[in-house]
């Protein structure tokens, strides 16, 4: 399993770095109660935080928005998209409650304020990544590394690259875009925004690489996310979790497992 950051990334973003968690031989088919509980708890916390501190005023979110602007890329950071998705679910639940379609809750309770809606489950590994995005407000990407024959590379988009959106439709790429690539297949475009179908984690995924992109202002939090993911993955999947940290001085990771 290999991940490399092209030196050109550091030319424009010298303070860029990434936390990694690699794991091989996971069973991603079976639901995990601990991960389900984590996703629900993270959803509850994120729902409360949305009431107290909107995304627009969150310093960490602004760091990623500023990086997109600096790179000339339009997009919504992955964690912001996930938080917005949760907000939509909460709003839908509140509308249903007003219409009398759900049981009423006490006005002084937490669920009375935001409901008890959690993000829909996808599969254990994806649920873990999305829960971490909600809890820490940082982007967390999970990549299916397949048979490990292809390295994951963070680089500029090139002619011949192919990106399929979540619906499987091919979308054109801009030449200035920063992408996560497995060969010519683009898994994430616009740096840390849009996840596609290529390289996406599915229930049958066995070998996985989690990547937490960050900058100087969010580095300490990203380290906490990496350590939290490694611990939870080890507990839930029962496999060895390999962690690493990449920056301009160490821009390549090769698994030793």
Model-derived regions, located:
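Charge-biased, low-complexity intrinsically disordered regions
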Residues: 1-257
């Amino acid at each position: 399993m290999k991940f490399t950051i092209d030196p050109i990334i550091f030319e424009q973003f010298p303070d860029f770095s990434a936390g990694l968690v690699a794991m091989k031989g996971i069973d991603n088919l079976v639901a995990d109660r601990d991960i389900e509980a984590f996703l629900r708890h993270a959803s509850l916390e994120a729902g409360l935080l949305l009431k107290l501190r909107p995304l627009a005023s969150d310093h960490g979110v602004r760091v990623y928005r500023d990086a997109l602007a600096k790179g000339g890329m339009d997009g919504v950071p992955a964690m912001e998209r996930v938080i917005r998705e949760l907000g939509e679910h909460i709003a839908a639940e509140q509308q249903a409650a007003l219409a009398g379609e759900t049981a009423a809750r006490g006005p002084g309770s937490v669920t009375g304020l935001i409901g008890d809606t959690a993000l829909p489950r996808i599969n254990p590994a994806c649920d873990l990544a999305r829960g971490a995005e909600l809890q820490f407000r940082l982007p967390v990407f999970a990549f299916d590394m397949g048979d490990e024959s292809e390295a994951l590379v963070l680089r500029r988009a090139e002619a011949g690259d192919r990106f399929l959106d979540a619906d499987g439709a091919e979308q054109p790429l801009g030449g200035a875009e920063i992408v996560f690539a497995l060969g010519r297949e683009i898994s994430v475009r616009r740096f840390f925004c849009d996840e596609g179908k290529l390289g996406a984690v599915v229930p049958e995924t066995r070998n996985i690489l989690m990547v937490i992109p960050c900058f100087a202002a969010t580095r300490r939090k990203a380290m906490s996310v990496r350590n939290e993911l490694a611990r939870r993955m080890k507990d839930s999947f029962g496999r060895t979790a390999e962690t690493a940290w990449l920056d301009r001085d160490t821009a390549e990771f090769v698994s030793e497992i």
